[in-house]
């Protein structure tokens, strides 16, 4: 569980509602404070700072776990602690109010303070030292015991089993606990009920994680099968210490001894934590949008993670959160791994903390990485995690605001999550005093989260300033090309720029952005011309002009609209081809012209079908429709500004299939939301054709379901091609653009035609292009 402190570095703004279908909560203002942003993504001190945070992560000290480790008796004497240094730490680190724990002053973390304080009191009583500290600790417990049964308080994992057991242990030690006997009895009854429920319904894995709450010898025997190869229970010092106290297990001792050698005076709540913490920090950097500053270190971290994955590391595979995050990061970045490794999490009962919303969310996100048509493990994980998260969201039980907003966003946009939108939302909700809560609270010690947040905000805003200038230039280009004179046409320069800026936002990708937007704008106007403004004769005239590219003056223009459209295409392609030559070292104009020609002919064919009232077969429609969807001219030209693409790559089956799957997604998504409007205009699409050829057997609802199935098929195939590296010759940066197109299309066509709507996407676009983020120190 992630928690937000009440004392924070806050992001302030004037909030606007925006949607795509229900996206909410963007901010505007400007950054306060200065952090030097490198001129290039590969320069400056920022890289060194983040590298240090990524490679040398330390967790905060855990009073709770240190107290349990301090309770372990010496091997040769039950009257002496095995680790006296831990006992000394407990005696030296009581807070002024009598409690132990992180100095958070969080009003909803009192249960955590109660748990840590009682563990420390038990330790002191166990060794009959620090009686004054004991009395102060008991006073704190007595003053705050109300929180133990307050459902609004954040509850440490297993609190209802562990805390009553510690109370029972204290009573047996002779402690005069300032508690009402009836309250103690009620907590003990609740503990026993939860223990029985855990045994009967969920197995015993979650019992092993909260082993210090067990009281029966049979329970201890049951949980021993969850002991890890390093001797611990789920890398938990407290659980392992409790197990050793009860069973004197040699492997438990070895683990505890390794802790003592690694940590001087006190222990964290998780150990080892190298993989988990590095994965967590890398995930944070990606969400903040600044991971590009440490690309080489990121690659090394992922290589290390992959090696641990292939070795079957306990630190990964016995922790569902770590497993899910590692799976998502590795598969996203092209590592060949099987989803079968997540099979143990196909049912919620197998989680050792089944109520951990953060864990369930990570499993849900991992389930979205299905790249094969038959990945039943991911399908089953998706089924239960999506249901569980929707239920918790509906009931309003996710108390942490940042986590609640992330769950809401991810559920509503499973396939439409765009990088820059997620960066902004994460920056907005990011809290520099966040702590995580498992059996006790903890945080990363050497991660300067204030610095990261300030840097991420300024990085976002600097890129945004660049976007604003580019968009101004593009809007002037629309006027200069006279495209704005065609009043029947949709003017979508801002939406087009928003789409590409959500992924290719870095300064280096200027030409790719310009190419994407110019082709998108022209294509939208041409599409409207074919549907609204032009006769078949005019359409044929435009195609002939493109066919006679260098000799177009011999053709002539059937209308002023044709002249405007042709010269927009002609001048833009010539200009882009000249720029691309400098990147590619060869002329790519013929490919760009042919791409446009193929698109224009496919749209003309559809116009002829409408005019002649032709009913095609489904195969005829699809084989033409994925081309008329129009992604070809937009994507192909942009890719020439990302990487050097040989003719072998451009003509490869891989390249063609990436385009085909992307275009199929485009066509089918559009058809699904426009079935009724297309029918009213006499146009056929993949929904109506199924009904027509179904001879009364297939309903429109069934046809929509089949189209949805087809979309998912092509989405998985596309994602597989994007992430797989073996046998691939298309550069990863280029494959990512195909995937971007898929996600932006899912966003635009989530529930209706958001691209054509003049207002539906405007606030989302403004959030990326026009509204900077403001950070204020409070």
From Swiss-Prot:
EC number: 4.2.3.29, 4.2.3.-
Chain sites annotated for binding Mg(2+) 1: 527, 531
Bridged cysteine pairs (disulfide): none
Keywords, in A-Z order: Chloroplast, Lyase, Magnesium, Metal-binding, Plastid, Transit peptide
Motif DDXXD motif: positions: 527-531
GO cellular component, one term: chloroplast
Cofactor note: Binds 3 Mg(2+) ions per subunit.
Cofactor(s) required for function per UniProt: Mg(2+)
Coiled coil: none
Pathway(s) this gene product operates in, as recorded in its UniProt entry: Secondary metabolite biosynthesis; terpenoid biosynthesis
Residues the entry annotates as binding Mg(2+) 3: 670-671, 678
Protein localization: Plastid, Chloroplast
Principal EC category: lyase
Transit peptide start-stop: 1-35
Main function: Diterpene cyclase involved in the biosynthesis of labdane-related diterpenoids (LRDs) natural products. Catalyzes the cyclization of ent-CDP into ent-sandaracopimaradiene as a major, and ent-pimaradiene and ent-labdatriene as minor products.
Name of this protein: Ent-sandaracopimaradiene synthase KSL3, chloroplastic
Annotated organism of origin: Ricinus communis (Castor bean)
Originating gene: KSL3
């Amino acid at each position: 569980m992630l928690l937000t402190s009440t004392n924070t570095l806050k992001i302030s703004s004037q909030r606007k509602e925006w949607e795509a279908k229900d996206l909410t909560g963007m901010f505007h203002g400007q950054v306060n404070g200065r952090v030097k942003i490198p001129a290039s993504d590969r320069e400056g001190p920022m890289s060194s700072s983040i590298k240090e945070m990524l490679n040398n992560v330390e967790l905060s000290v855990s009073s709770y776990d240190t107290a349990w480790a301090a309770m372990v008796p010496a091997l040769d004497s039950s009257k002496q602690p095995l680790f006296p240094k831990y006992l000394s730490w407990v005696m030296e680190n009581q807070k002024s109010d009598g409690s132990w724990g992180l100095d958070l002053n969080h009003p909803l973390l009192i249960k955590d303070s109660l748990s840590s304080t009682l563990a420390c009191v038990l330790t002191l009583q166990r060794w009959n030292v620090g009686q004054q500290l004991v009395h102060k600790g008991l006073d704190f417990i007595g003053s705050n015991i109300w929180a133990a049964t307050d459902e609004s308080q954040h509850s440490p994992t297993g609190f209802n089993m562990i805390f009553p057991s510690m109370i029972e242990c204290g009573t047996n030690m002779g402690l005069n606990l300032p508690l009402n006997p009836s309250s103690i009895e009620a907590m003990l009854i609740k503990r026993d009920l939860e223990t029985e429920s855990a045994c009967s319904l969920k197995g015993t894995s979650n019992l092993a994680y909260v082993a210090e709450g067990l009281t029966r010898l049979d329970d201890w025997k049951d949980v021993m099968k969850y002991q890890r190869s390093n001797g611990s229970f789920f890398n938990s010092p407290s659980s392992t210490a409790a197990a050793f106290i009860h069973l004197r297990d040699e492997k438990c001792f070895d683990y505890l001894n390794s802790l003592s050698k690694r940590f001087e005076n006190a222990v964290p709540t998780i150990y080892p934590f190298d993989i988990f913490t590095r994965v967590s920090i890398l995930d944070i950097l990606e969400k903040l949008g600044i991971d590009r500053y440490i690309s080489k270190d990121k690659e090394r971290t992922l290589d290390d993670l992959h090696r641990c994955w292939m070795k079957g590391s306990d630190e990964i595979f016995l922790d569902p959160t770590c497993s899910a995050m590692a799976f998502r990061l590795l598969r996203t970045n092209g590592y060949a791994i099987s989803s079968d490794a997540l099979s143990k999490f196909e049912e919620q009962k197998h989680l050792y903390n089944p109520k951990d919303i953060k864990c369930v969310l990570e499993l849900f996100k991992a389930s979205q990485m299905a790249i094969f048509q038959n990945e039943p493990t991911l399908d089953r994980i998706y089924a239960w995690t999506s249901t569980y998260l929707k239920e918790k969201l509906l009931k309003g039980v996710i108390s942490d605001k940042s986590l609640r907003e992330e769950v809401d966003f991810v559920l509503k946009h499973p396939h439409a999550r765009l990088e820059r939108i997620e960066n902004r939302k994460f920056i907005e909700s990011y809290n520099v005093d966040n702590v995580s809560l498992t059996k006790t609270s903890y945080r990363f010690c050497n991660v300067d989260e204030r610095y990261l947040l300030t840097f991420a905000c300024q990085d976002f805003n600097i890129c945004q300033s660049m976007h604003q200038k580019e968009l101004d230039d593009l809007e002037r280009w629309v006027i200069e090309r006279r495209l704005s004179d065609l009043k029947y046409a949709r003017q979508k320069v801002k939406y087009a720029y928003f789409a590409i800026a959500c992924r290719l936002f870095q300064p280096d990708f200027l030409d790719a952005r310009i190419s994407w937007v110019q082709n998108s704008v022209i294509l939208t106007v041409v599409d409207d011309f074919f549907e609204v403004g032009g006769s078949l004769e005019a359409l044929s005239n435009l195609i002939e002009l493109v066919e006679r590219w260098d000799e177009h003056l011999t053709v002539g223009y059937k209308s002023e609209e044709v002249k405007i459209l042709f010269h927009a295409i002609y001048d833009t392609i010539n200009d882009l081809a000249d720029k691309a030559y400098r990147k590619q070292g060869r002329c790519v104009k013929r490919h760009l012209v042919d791409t446009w020609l193929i698109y224009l002919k496919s749209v003309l064919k559809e116009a002829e079908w409408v005019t002649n009232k032709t009913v095609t077969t489904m195969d005829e429609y699809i084989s033409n429709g994925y081309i008329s969807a129009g992604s070809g001219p937009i994507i192909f030209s942009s890719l020439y500004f990302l990487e050097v693409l040989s003719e072998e790559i451009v003509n490869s089956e891989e390249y063609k299939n990436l385009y085909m799957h992307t275009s199929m997604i485009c066509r089918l998504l559009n058809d699904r939301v426009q079935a009724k409007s297309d029918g009213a205009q006499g146009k056929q699409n993949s929904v109506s054709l199924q009904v027509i050829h179904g001879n009364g057997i297939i309903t429109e609802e069934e046809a929509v379901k089949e189209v949805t199935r087809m979309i998912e098929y092509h989405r998985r195939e596309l994602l597989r091609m994007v992430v797989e590296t073996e046998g691939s010759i298309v550069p990863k940066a280029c494959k990512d653009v195909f995937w971007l197109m898929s996600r932006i299309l899912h966003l635009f066509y989530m529930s209706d035609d958001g691209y054509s709507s003049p207002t539906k996407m405007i606030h989302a676009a403004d959030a990326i292009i026009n509204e900077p983020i403001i950070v204020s120190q409070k």
